[in-house]
A protein has these predicted regions:
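N-terminal beta1-alpha1-beta2 submodule of the flavodoxin-like/Rossmannoid cofactor-binding fold
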Residues: 1-114, 180-219
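Short, glycine-/small-residue-rich phosphate/pyrophosphate-handling segment
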Residues: 97, 110-172
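Beta-strand-loop-alpha "switch" segments that mediate conformational coupling across diverse proteins
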Residues: 173-178
């Protein structure tokens, strides 16, 4: 089973480093791992056109019709069995690119709505929705901020949790890595790197479990 690490931060910097540390530990626990930095992807905002829901209601698969790079990340998330997500916080909340993805991915893949639609399709003998929509996935969140005080990154983790909320991912760990401006590089903080590794271990140990059996570890 595969753990996907997603970094919305600068290439080679704190978000990347902490995500990869989590992935290294997940791999040591026996999981396959994949890493993607999405900073160069063009992920535009949702236009509320309703096409994704309309396609679903017409018996088709869920699809966003905007022509950008959203689909690259969407497919990687759907293929994964567990997620480690990291994003920088510059002004209280995570970067807008993450929110753009959440706004398009979350409502389109809402598990409650998709469960209802899948039951309808079964009863009417229609083409079923993609089975990947219904995976139970563990996820761990890493909020990365340069601010010295926690209040300047206070909405980092809460907003990041929206990534997995409507699709029913289970949070199995989180890390609020603020004050990174003075730390300079996470590898200089042994305790921080250990906590990042613990997230990867938690995700790996919860792979393949039903949501009610997944356990939370960390802060």
């Amino acid at each position: 089973m595969k753990v996907l690490g997603i970094s919305f931060g600068r290439k080679g910097h704190c978000s990347d480093i902490l995500t990869k540390e989590a992935l290294f530990e997940a791999k040591r626990c026996g999981a396959d791992v994949e890493f993607i930095n999405v900073i160069d992807l063009n992920i535009g905002h949702c236009t509320a056109c309703g096409a994704c829901g309309a396609a679903r209601d017409r018996g088709k698969q869920v699809k966003c019709y905007r022509k950008d790079d959203y689909h690259i990340l969407e497919e990687k998330v759907l293929d994964a069995d567990g997620i480690v997500l990291a994003a920088p916080v510059y002004a209280v909340a995570p970067v807008g690119q993450l929110k753009n993805f959440i706004d398009r991915f979350g409502p389109a893949h809402d598990r409650a709505a998709l469960n209802k639609e899948q039951e309808r399709r079964k009863k009417e003998g229609m083409e079923l929705l993609d089975a990947r929509y219904f995976k139970d996935r563990p996820i761990a969140y890493i909020s990365v901020g340069g601010a010295i005080t926690q209040n300047w990154v206070s909405m980092g983790l809460p907003i990041m949790h929206l990534f997995g909320m409507s699709v029913k991912m289970k949070s199995v760990g989180r890390l609020d890595a603020y004050d990174m401006g003075r730390t300079a590089n996470p590898v200089l903080d042994e305790k921080l790197m250990s906590r990042a590794a613990a997230l990867g271990r938690s995700v790996a140990q919860n792979l393949g479990k039903p949501l009610e059996e997944m356990t939370f570890a960390g802060d």
